[in-house]
C-alpha cells in the first residue's frame, strides 16, 4: 500500500457510524503505512489522548474539534504528508474535506480516494453543494460508495470523470456472534426474563423509526403476550419516545438503555429475539439511510432482521431469507411482521442462521480492507485539473 494520509472529521473516540467505519478499515491496513489527521476530541466519556496512545498507527490531531477545507487545514495536511512521506490521501468523507484534493495532489499526492456514506445524497440535491461534489469528482481518483442506492442518487453529481467504486461497511463476525451468556446478562440487567423481545440498536433520531416500533407494540402484544422492546442507544428523540410509550400504555414494556459502551453492543444484540430498525427517509429525501450496518451486525449475531425501505437499507437484508423489508411508515405492517417472527421461533432461528452465513461470506471487514488497499495502491487516473 502507498503510505496513506487519512484526512477526516470523523474518527474515534468521537462516537458514530462513520467513525467506526473508518477505524475498522484503518486498523486493518498496515499500521506503518497509515497516518491519520483528525480533529481533537475531549469529553468526559473519553479523550483522543488515550485513544491515540493505543492506536496501532500514528494519529495527528487538529487543535479544534472541527475540520473544514480551510487554508489552515490544507497547510497542516501538506506538512503531515511531506513529513511522513505520504503518497496517497484518503478522505474519510468526501464532503467537504475532499475539496482539498486538488491542492494536495499539487503537493505530491499520487493517489486520492474519497469515501462517501449517505449524507452526500442530500448534498447532491442542493445546487451549491452539488457543485462542490462535482469539483471533488473531477479531482480525486476514486469515490467510494456504501450502497447501490447512494451511488444511483449521487453519481451524476460527482460527474462523468468520477471513478466510483463500492466499499460498504463490514462486520467483524468474531465480535458479532451468537453469545448465550451475553444474552442472559443483558436480559437480567433490564429485567426482561424470557419475554419475547424486539431489539433496536441505533441513535434515537426520527429517521431510525423507534417511534414506529413503539406504535406497533400494542398490536404485537395482542398476538404475542409479554412482548417487549429493547431500544439501545441515546439521542435527542428519547423524551418524545418516552412520552409516546406512556400515551400508548406500553411504558413498562419498552426498555431504554441509553448509550452503551461499544464492547457491550454484541451482548445487547444477543438480548433480542428479532432485530428491527424500520428506517424511513425524511426531509424531502435529504435525511436517508446510506446502508445500515446495524442490520448486518444483527444478522452476524444470528437474529432475523426487519428493515425499513429508506435508501440502501434493503441492501443489508435478503428479503424473506435473512429477514424482511417493510414500509417504515406503516406500524400495522410492522406489527404483523414482528409478531409473526416472535411467534415462530423456528422460522426466526432459520432466518438468523441464514443471515450469519450471508454476512460471513459477503460482508467481512477483512474483505473490505483488502479492497481499500487495492484502491489506494492503484495507478493515478485523475489528471490534475
Regions found by a protein language model. Name each.
Residues 149, 170:
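Carbohydrate-associated surface elements
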Residues 316-320, 324-332, 340-346:
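Conserved acidic donor-binding segment of nucleotide-sugar-dependent glycosyltransferases
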Residues 276, 295, 300, 304-307, ...:
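Short hydrophobic beta-strand element within catalytic cores of glycosyltransferases
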Residues 91-97:
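Short His-centered aromatic/hydrophobic patch
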Residues 144, 192-208, 214-217:
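Conserved donor-binding/catalytic core segment of Leloir-type glycosyltransferases
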Residues 226, 253, 333, 340, ...:
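A short, well-ordered alpha-helix in the C-terminal region of glycosyltransferases
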Residues 239-264, 274:
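Nucleotide-activated donor-binding/catalytic signature segment of Leloir-type glycosyltransferases, i.e.
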Residues 259, 270-288, 303:
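Acidic donor-binding loop of glycosyltransferase active sites
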